[in-house]
Amino acid sequence: MKALNKETAAKTQRPERIIQFGEGNFLRAFVDWIIYNMNEKTDFNSSVVVVQPIEKGMVDMLNAQDCLYHVNLQGLDKGQVVNSLTKIDVISRALNPYSQNDEFMKLAEQPEMRFVISNTTEAGIAFDPACKLDDAPASSYPGKLTQLLYHRYKTFNGDKSKGLIIFPCELIFLNGHKLKETIYQYIDLWNLGEDFKQWFEEACGVYATLVDRIVPGFPRKDIAAIKEKLQYDDNLVVQAEIFHLWVIEAPQEVAKEFPADKAGLNVLFVPSEAPYHERKVTLLNGPHTVLSPVAYLSGINIVREACEHEVVGKYIHKVMFDELMETLNLPKEELKKFAEDVLERFNNPFVDHQVTSIMLNSFPKYETRDLPGLKVYLERKGELPKGLVLGLAAIITYYKGGVRADGAEIVPNDAPEIMNLLKELWATGCTQKVAEGVLAAESIWGENLNNIPGLTAAVKADLDSIQEKGMLETVKGIL
């Protein structure tokens, strides 16, 4: 079996135009895969220099393979099973600024550099007042980026055509706003001056983005078979699902410079990220939260099997298409396409997603993901959404414990205050008290949900039905 490097595998040389902070699985299977497709299908013609954002990382492994690796996409695409391997050749080199700080800073001197992309985890975009301008390098990611920008500003004497377009991918709502704010803090801390601040404001753009792709990472279970198939000893294979979405809150001039649409990619440049964030929370996370207890109490353990089930599958379809979708303010066709993609993701034959892994903290999840939809639906339709109400009753029933219809013991696990509350309420033996007590828990909901017209009676009725008929018969009753 051959080693994987530029001697054994073709690697196209392209101009270095992108600095990427982060070398982990997500960026390599998402951003670098997107750039690979843009290079293949458009005239983008760019390569990436990877910068390791912390002292210990993977740049040595990357450089050992001349930054070549494969992405293994697995899942359903329009109902067809896909299991593909693609060699990604877009990373030209990988730097560790803790041992190669001069080379890192020289990136700012390359006139053709245009983009900065990052994923330094949710904790990465943070201000550390201990960072100094002459640190080699600053410990925080925004500190390193400010050092780089300031060096570029000085190198090109404030030339506004040498600004950079910055796309953070960290999982923080409005991540671009947070990063920009943190850079301003460093400009002030280090007294870099009003002229530099103005150059940063006018020549550079920091744009909020929303990323979405499940990336399980290195395929330990399948790696021997993958290497055999490739005939390369690739130790950086990264597995990912087919679905990908990158929403970038930026004007069309930026989209023209980053022509992902011409490569047929699901990259959207939009005036506001907020509705897409809401869409993801409502149509991806929201269904997960109610599907899991309904499936579990029906004797189903895996998300895919729940979606395939003749009764529970119809339930989740109803919740998504008839209830939650009705509460969002985006074009209907766009929402329908997104919901269909979500169902394909839930049905991924390569992922056994245990419903119990989703059920931890179910009440707070319901409060952020499903309760807003329940309220909007009631306001717009004048009635409660039966699927979302049943999902809430299923969560409450799960916390009762006991035994499932198939004989499996139900062992709920959550924060002690939730467990204690539900234990006390179920000990009364009265579903009216259980419904009222849960809905009245302002520590969970931030309000008394008994004030929502009809909700207490609807939850009680579902609790009674689940106790008397079982979960599946109760689900059938609302379809």
UniProtKB/Swiss-Prot annotation:
Pathway: Carbohydrate metabolism; pentose and glucuronate interconversion
A biological-process GO annotation: mannitol catabolic process
Keyword vocabulary terms for this entry: NAD, Oxidoreductase
Signal peptide (residue range): none
Residues that, per the record, bind NAD(+): I18, I19, Q20, F21, G22, E23, G24, N25, F26, L27, R28, A29
E.C. numbers: 1.1.1.58
InterPro entries: 6-PGluconate_DH-like_C_sf (IPR008927), 6PGD_dom2 (IPR013328), Altronate_OxRdtase (IPR023668), Mannitol_DH_C (IPR013118), Mannitol_DH_N (IPR013131), NAD(P)-bd_dom_sf (IPR036291)
A GO CC term assigned to this protein in UniProt: cytosol
Catalysed reactions, semicolon-separated: D-altronate + NAD(+) = keto-D-tagaturonate + NADH + H(+)
Family: Belongs to the mannitol dehydrogenase family. UxaB subfamily.
Protein name (database record): Altronate oxidoreductase
Protein's organism: Phocaeicola vulgatus (strain ATCC 8482 / DSM 1447 / JCM 5826 / CCUG 4940 / NBRC 14291 / NCTC 11154) (Bacteroides vulgatus)
Lineage: Bacteria, Pseudomonadati, Bacteroidota, Bacteroidia, Bacteroidales
Gene name in the database record: uxaB
